[in-house]
From Swiss-Prot:
The protein's role, per its UniProt record: Catalyzes the reversible cleavage of L-rhamnulose-1-phosphate to dihydroxyacetone phosphate (DHAP) and L-lactaldehyde.
Gene Ontology cellular component terms for the protein in this record: cytosol
Protein source organism: Escherichia coli (strain SMS-3-5 / SECEC)
Cofactor dependence: Zn(2+)
Binding partners and assembly: Homotetramer.
Active site (UniProt): E117
Lineage, highest ranks first: Bacteria, Pseudomonadati, Pseudomonadota, Gammaproteobacteria, Enterobacterales
Cofactor remark from the record: Binds 1 zinc ion per subunit.
One GO term of the biological process aspect: rhamnose catabolic process
Protein name: Rhamnulose-1-phosphate aldolase
Catalytic activity line of the entry: L-rhamnulose 1-phosphate = (S)-lactaldehyde + dihydroxyacetone phosphate
Length: 274
């Protein structure tokens, strides 16, 4: 019998959650991570599945995700503990045939349930599937320190925030030319914040929750982690720059245009226009 804890997707989740903890992005039970799988990914591990998988209804149907398996982090679980006990802190779930709920096939032992942000994740998965023709498979939420700090001092506007991050590090425009969506402050763990996040995910692979954290989307765990890491590095640079009295010089609009042309990306027009 093959052991599911040695699968690429469980090992990938262990690495991503451990790396995020070491970065300082996921204190206590902060943060959550979901990865969309295929049936072929989980097929070799049926012998590891629960004999009687628990069924949990969704707060709203998501037919686009019907019959789709995911691996998810658990509610109230600490990222730092995933590496110690994957089965207690992670779960493989599969949405049912009408998208109305899901079964917990593996993991989430002792009656644990998926992250409370699952509505935001699933709604965002739906939008990123449509926006990327199915390429994006990962949604990651974390409390990236410097990005959060900037939401207290910058105007919480997509164009303004995006332009500042682009100027904070040359690679940013190349990595997220679509910019950073920003929500107003909202109560977490609700359908409302999930819907608002998903709406921004139609246009942006990064979405900021002011005074709280960031959502990122990508095709792989590495790409999604790298996306957030890149934005966070720029935010760290900006925090240092602002603390030293602000910018004396920066990357110009013309230079940003040239950067986009060199790497074949189309920068967010509203951010470029500032």
């Amino acid at each position: 019998m093959q052991n599911i804890t040695q699968s690429w997707f469980v090992q990938g989740m262990i690495k991503a959650t451990t790396d995020a903890w070491l970065k300082g992005w996921d204190e206590r039970n902060g943060g959550n991570l979901t990865l969309r799988l295929d049936d072929a990914d989980i097929a070799p591990y049926h012998d590891n599945f629960h004999a009687q998988p628990r069924y949990i209804p969704l707060s709203q149907p998501m037919p686009l995700l019907a019959n789709t398996p995911f691996i998810v982090t658990g509610s109230g679980k600490f990222f730092r503990n995933v590496q110690l006990d994957p089965a207690a802190n992670l779960g493989v779930v599969k949405v049912d045939s009408d998208g109305a709920g899901y079964h917990i096939l593996w993991g989430l032992t002792n009656e644990a349930v998926p992250t409370s942000e699952l509505p935001a994740h699933f709604l965002s998965h739906c939008e990123r599937i449509k926006a990327t023709n199915g390429k994006d498979r990962v949604i990651m939420h974390c409390h990236a320190t410097n990005l959060i700090a900037l939401t207290y001092v910058l105007e919480n506007d997509t164009a303004v925030f995006t332009r500042q991050l682009w100027e904070g590090s040359t690679e940013c425009l190349v990595v997220f030319p679509d910019g950073v969506g920003i929500l107003p402050w909202m109560v977490p763990g609700t359908d409302e914040i999930g819907q608002a996040t998903a709406q921004e995910m139609q246009k942006h692979s990064l979405v900021l929750w002011p005074f709280h954290g960031v959502f990122g989307s990508g095709p792989t765990l590495d790409e999604t982690f790298g996306l957030i890491d890149t934005a966070e590095k720029s935010a760290q640079v900006l925090v240092k720059v602002y603390s030293m009295g602000g910018m004396k010089q920066t990357i110009s609009r013309e230079e940003l245009i040239a950067l986009g042309q060199r790497f074949g990306v189309t920068p967010l027009a509203s951010a470029l226009a500032l």
